[in-house]
C-alpha cells in the first residue's frame, strides 16, 4: 500500500478520518483500511493548511510514517519525539486535535509545533533542530530507571542529522545496550532514490527481525574466541550491507541499522516497526520520504510550499498582484550583494537558512564566497571567526532564536578575540505564528553583556541598510537586529552612509510645560509605535539606534530636559536595551523616574504579530496607556507627590 496523489476538489468526506479521535481508534482499524485513511489524512492536511497557512511540504511527507507509528506502538505510553516539530500536523490530527486544526498557529489556537501542555501525545516540546535523540534517550533511560516498559522514539530529518548535537546523542545512546530506543531517520533528500520493490521490503524485514538480531549476536559470541575471524566476519557483513544501505556509520555508534525503506509504503513500514518493537537496544530505522508527497505542486517545488500562507489548493500559490513593502530580509540580501560587489573580502555564511535569510541571489552571484554550513550554528560562528583572522569580512546571517545556540562561540571564539564579524540578526522580536520557540526575545540581553560587541537595532528599511554598512566598517564584532516580515515602506538609499558610532537621534520634541514632559527612548521596531503614542501624549521620541554603546550623552540630555523617561524595545525587559539606558542614567548622576516597556518575563505565544504586540502593550495605544497610567494620570500625580513628601 503506497501513497496516491491527492485529487483535490474540496469535497472529501473523511469517512474514516472522522472516526479517529485518538490512536486507540486507529489501532482498531483493519490493515486494509490504513491506506484509504492515509489518503484522507493527506487531503485533510492540504485543505487545513491552505486555510490557515503553515508548514505543508514536510507534513504531506510524514502521513504514512505517522499512521504506522501510532498503529504499531502503544502511544502515549510509548513516547514519540518529533525533531523540529513542524511535520507533526498528521500527528496532531490523529491525537484528538482534528477539529482544532482551523485554529493552527492562530491567536489562542493550537501550536504549529509539539507542545506538552497541549496534549499528552506531545511528549517533548520541539521547534529547534536536532534535539530529538537526546530527549528520547533521556526518556528511554528514565523509563528503565523507573521500571517502566516502553519504547522511546526519535523522528529526525536528514537535515537535522547534520548538527553536532544529534551525533553527541547517538554517541551516548550507543553504549546504552538495553535501552528501548528507536531513532527514525526521515530522509527526504531526493538525491537519494527511494528504494522500492520486494527486495528492499525483504531486506528491511530481515534486518529488523528477531532471527537476524539473535543470529548476529550469536555469531559474535561464538567467534569472539577468535578475534581475527570475528573481524573478518564483521567486514564481510559491512561489505554486504554496504552494497544496499549506508549502515556502517550508524552501527559504529552502537545502533542496529535497518533500511532504507519506503516511508510512503505502509506494507514496508508496519511489519518493520512491528519487528523493531520486539528488539532491545538502540535501533536505527532509515525511511525515505518525499516532501510534498501526494500534492503535485508541492512535490515539484517543496521549498515554495514549505511554509505557505493561505492559498487555493486547486490553483496553487499565485504571485501577489499588489506591490508589497520590501521585507527586512530582502533589504539584507540586497545589501550583502552590493557590498560583495564593492569588496571581494565580503563572505556570506548561513546555517541552513539560505531562503529564509535572503541569500539566494548572493549564492548565485558570489558562489565562491557563499557558505551554507548546515544546521550548525556553533560552527558557523567560529568558522566566521577563522575567516576574520585571514583578513576577510564574514557576515553571519542568522535568526535571533538560533544565535542562542552559539552563545559560547560568540563569546569565546569571536568577542574575546575582538574579531570583526558582522551578525545580521533576522527575526528579532516577536515572530507571529511561529510563537515562543522562534521569538527573538533575548538577543539584546545576551549580547549586551559581552565585551567588544557593538549592537544596533533598525527602525526602518533604509536604516537597516545603513546599519549593516556601518557594521561592516567596524574593527570588532557587530550585530544588527531587524524583524521578520515587511518594513515600514521607507525607500532604501543606494548610496551608503556610515552612522556615527553610538549616536541616536531625536525624532520628535514635546511642547509640554515642565512637570509633564515625557521622553520616549525607542529602539528599532518600537520607534514607529512610540511616535504614534507621542502624538497622543505630546511626548519627545528618540530613535536610540545603538543598544551598545548606548548614547549616554543623549540619555543624559533627555533626562535633564524632561520629567519622565520611558524606554521601549521589542525584546525582554530584563537586561535589555532599557537596562542600558538606566545604567547610563545612573552613571550620569541625573535622577528621573523611568518606565521600561518591552516583552514580559514570560514566553509569548503564537498569533498575529499585531495582536501580540497589543497584548504586550507595545502598540501605539498600549505605550500611551502605560505612560499615562504611570506618569500622567491623577493617581500617578498623587503617588508621585506622596513619594516626594516622603
Swiss-Prot record:
Signal peptide (UniProt feature, chain positions): none
Domain of life of the source: Bacteria
UniProt remark on cofactor binding: Binds 1 Mg(2+) ion per subunit.
GO cellular component labels: cytosol
Catalytic reactions on record: D-glyceraldehyde 3-phosphate + pyruvate + H(+) = 1-deoxy-D-xylulose 5-phosphate + CO2
Record EC number: 2.2.1.7
Pfam families cross-referenced by the UniProt entry: DXP_synthase_N, Transket_pyr, Transketolase_C
InterPro entries, per database record: Dxylulose-5-P_synthase, THDP-binding, Transketo_C/PFOR_II, Transketolase-like_Pyr-bd, Transketolase_BS, Transketolase_C, Transketolase_CS
Pathway: Metabolic intermediate biosynthesis; 1-deoxy-D-xylulose 5-phosphate biosynthesis; 1-deoxy-D-xylulose 5-phosphate from D-glyceraldehyde 3-phosphate and pyruvate: step 1/1
Function, in words: Catalyzes the acyloin condensation reaction between C atoms 2 and 3 of pyruvate and glyceraldehyde 3-phosphate to yield 1-deoxy-D-xylulose-5-phosphate (DXP).
NCBIfam families xrefs: dxs, PRK05444.2-2
The protein's name: 1-deoxy-D-xylulose-5-phosphate synthase
Gene: dxs
